[in-house]
């Protein structure tokens, strides 16, 4: 509710993944508590898994109710309380999750739900002596600000706070010339445009060999022509409104840069309408320059930028992909050539924390694909695994 999600995206998030996090985090906690050191004859060694000394500040984004479930449940299962600041653009859905917790019997004061101004709340919370940690999902800029505030207040705290964060990405799809064009096109469309591209894992840039481009392009354009854009109440609408006017304006500013540049061409979409809601057409940009701004910067909207490379420059373009963006969250390689898959995996080892073969870079499942990346994408603490609870 209030997130601009159609029924299909809502079911994936606010039903299935919420339940998965609750169930799996309980299971992961039990594994952690059972892990004990060996004891020699006549002695007993024991690990006491004590909570951090204080409370955890959890800051959750607008795009996934499930993330709020994970950030709070992982903390309280390990014995800490939370001060929970939900995104101001998704208060309603998070409020209902809080009410469900209370109806289920969660004691008062375990999760403390505090919607409001992020800067005002953080200014109080991050100066508190009992702050023991921060569990964050959101923008890179906000995370950097919080980290700096924590650093500036180190003399205040009882202990060094543990900081865990996931901060977005500039996620890629990379195709080798042995790739299957229809599979590749499907990954581009679904990976870039589901939930209007408002996923940390959403595909935002693609590298396609020249020999594969025309047939892939025809599939992509056909699929986009069949996409309907509109209100979430009409289940025929695959693409719905972006979260707010600020997001709309930011997305359209990137599209405008492509419209006015001789280094890029828009081959699909490119229009937006905020007369009633904030709707942006699924947009595909072909960049002549691999360092064009929409290839490098996170947009967080339904915009995919494609760079077409010469087939004989596969390894050179892999290196280009690795070095183009400061992020390192998700990515995928499409190839039927095992050597190419292995080569891509080695070159792009640090370019993605979640790396997929012949699949779109979105849709990590709790317990199956632990989620998180490094570089500017965060601390790589792998949500959906026991590592996120430690």
Map each language-model feature to its residues.
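Conserved C-terminal structural/oligomerization subdomain of aldehyde/semialdehyde dehydrogenase
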Residues: 106, 130-131, 186, 222-228, ...
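Long amphipathic alpha-helix in the N-terminal Rossmann-like dinucleotide-binding domain
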Residues: 3-33, 46-47
């Amino acid at each position: 509710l209030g997130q601009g999600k159609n029924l299909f995206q809502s079911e994936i998030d606010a039903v299935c993944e919420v339940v998965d996090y609750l169930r799996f985090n309980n299971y992961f906690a039990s594994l952690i508590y059972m892990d004990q050191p060996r004891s020699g004859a006549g002695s007993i060694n024991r690990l006491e898994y004590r909570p951090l000394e204080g409370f955890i500040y959890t800051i959750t984004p607008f795009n996934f109710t499930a993330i709020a479930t994970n950030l709070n449940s992982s903390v309280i299962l390990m014995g800490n309380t939370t001060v929970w600041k939900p995104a101001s653009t998704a208060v309603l859905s998070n409020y209902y999750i809080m009410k469900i917790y209370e109806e289920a019997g969660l004691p008062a004061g375990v999760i403390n739900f505090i919607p409001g101004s992020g800067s005002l709340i953080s200014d109080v919370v991050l100066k508190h002596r009992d702050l023991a940690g921060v569990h964050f999902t959101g923008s890179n800029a906000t995370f950097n600000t919080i980290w700096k505030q924590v650093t500036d207040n180190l003399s205040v705290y009882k202990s060094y706070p543990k900081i865990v964060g996931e901060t977005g990405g500039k996620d890629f799809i990379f195709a080798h010339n042995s790739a299957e064009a229809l599979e590749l096109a499907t990954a581009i469309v679904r990976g870039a445009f589901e939930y209007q591209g408002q996923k940390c894992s959403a595909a935002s840039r693609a590298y396609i060999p020249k020999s594969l481009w025309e047939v892939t392009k025809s599939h992509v354009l056909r699929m986009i022509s069949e996409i309907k854009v509109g209100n979430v109440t009409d289940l025929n609408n695959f693409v719905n409104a972006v979260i707010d006017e600020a997001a709309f304006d930011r997305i359209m500013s990137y599209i405008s840069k492509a419209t006015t540049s001789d280094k890029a061409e828009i081959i699909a979409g490119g229009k937006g309408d905020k007369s009633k809601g904030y709707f942006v057409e699924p947009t595909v940009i072909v960049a002549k320059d691999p360092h064009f701004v929409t290839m490098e910067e996170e947009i967080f909207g339904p915009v995919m930028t494609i760079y077409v490379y010469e087939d004989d420059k596969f390894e050179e373009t892999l290196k280009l992909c690795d070095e183009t963006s400061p992020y390192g969250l998700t990515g995928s390689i499409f190839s039927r050539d095992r050597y190419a898959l292995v080569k891509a995996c080695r070159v792009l080892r640090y370019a993605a924390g979640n790396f997929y073969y012949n699949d779109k870079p979105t849709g990590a499942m709790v317990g199956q694909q632990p989620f998180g990346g490094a570089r500017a994408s965060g601390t790589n603490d792998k949500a959906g695994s026991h590592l996120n609870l430690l």
